Curated annotation (Swiss-Prot):
Any single Pfam family the record assigns to this protein: Toxin_8
UniProt propeptide residues: 22-46
Entry protein name: Alpha-conotoxin-like Am1.6
Expression tissues: Expressed by the venom duct.
Task of the protein: Alpha-conotoxins act on postsynaptic membranes, they bind to the nicotinic acetylcholine receptors (nAChR) and thus inhibit them.
Source organism of the structure: Conus amadis
Gene Ontology, cellular component aspect: extracellular region; host cell postsynaptic membrane
Keyword line: Acetylcholine receptor inhibiting toxin, Disulfide bond, Neurotoxin, Postsynaptic neurotoxin, Secreted, Signal, Toxin
Chain residue ranges for the region called Ser-Xaa-Pro motif, crucial for potent interaction with nAChR: 50-52
Superkingdom of the organism of origin: Eukaryota
Subcellular location: Secreted
Main location: secreted
Signal peptide (from-to): 1-21
Length: 63
């Protein structure tokens, strides 16, 4: 292989590695966002259940 061909292969490998790491990073962001939303919902329900007026208005949340 010539020097130019080796350099081209090197650039393709670097590009492929960057694309794979970028997409896996974005996927983990989505999972983290879903976990944070779930935690926020649980915190809101817990806060509602600790206050009697909210608990009486939403008994399905605090059963």
């Amino acid at each position: 292989m010539g020097m130019r061909m080796m350099f081209t292969v090197f650039l393709l490998v670097v590009l492929a590695t960057t694309v794979v790491s970028f997409t896996s990073y974005r996927a983990s962001d989505g999972r983290n966002a879903a976990a944070k939303a779930s935690d926020l919902i649980a915190l809101t329900v817990r806060d509602c259940c600790s206050r009697p007026p909210c608990r009486w208005s939403h008994p399905e949340l605090c059963s």
